[in-house]
């Protein structure tokens, strides 16, 4: 199984170009895209944007039970329409059957078609953090879509961390939380150090010019490949994929030669945003039923640290589903494949009471 850095790129491109085809093939309604503008949006820095554009995709009718699904870093909402995710969840009789659920896939601030530095402000764009991103999602859901309650918030990687933030900041707004490939604790250890290497590498690139570059700094692509290999893919899966030096060289060379279309400012902002993430102090405020899903071979969130078990003790009724590592898993990217956990989510929704909306 290829590492997530390649999978997500391919999945995102496929979702963008073949949304309608995938929907028909997977037997769920054709996704619909929309935009909403949050007026006078205040960032944690105190800066205010008079008009913050938020793009989103929905699957299903607004009359269905609303479900918010949050993508990972450098993705967009349409990444979650990848067949390995959506085709396992949104079809008839599946855990998030779109004939019963109203599925909301936002492009989080700085990503996709939502407002981001490359739209024109470049390095003058406000430096957002995860709290800002979640606050924008809340405004989109409550003001833009007119919803008063969510049945479920589910997120992957960055989206998983922001799922924890949702539970802390808006504890009575949802019935259930499914944070995936994440920990409810501050950035630390390898996870943060690797993120620093991405952002510092871009800032130290000779072409950077404080974000006012004339050509895209090469460091963004090189550091992206480095980070992807170091923090995604799974040990056993990589050994199977590249069992010799020749195979490993080819894999690396292919990734370095692959098209890289990300803007360096966008990329830096996306990774920088996690710096002050830390939901731990507020975990006891969570009211929703929590099912955390991680994989045993997650390079960013290794289970042997015991962090998840320690913090879950403070979440009433919170529990962890840990996917065993194997040649068929892909480290941090394992949970992007819904086949590994869809049954657990179905059982969660069957047993979690619905609150009044």
Mark where each language-model region is.
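Conserved acidic catalytic loop of the alpha/beta-hydrolase fold
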Residues: 131-151
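Conserved hydrolase catalytic core segment
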Residues: 148-188
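Conserved alpha/beta-hydrolase "acid-adjacent" motif
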Residues: 299-306
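Alpha/beta-hydrolase-fold enzymes
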Residues: 173-257
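Active-site nucleophile elbow and catalytic-triad environment of alpha/beta-hydrolase enzymes
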Residues: 266-282
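Short beta-strand/loop motif that positions the catalytic acidic residue
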Residues: 286, 292-294
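N-terminal cap/lid subdomain of alpha/beta-hydrolase-fold enzymes
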Residues: 57-119
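Catalytic active-site module of serine/aspartate enzymes centered on a nucleophile-bearing elbow/loop
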Residues: 318-357
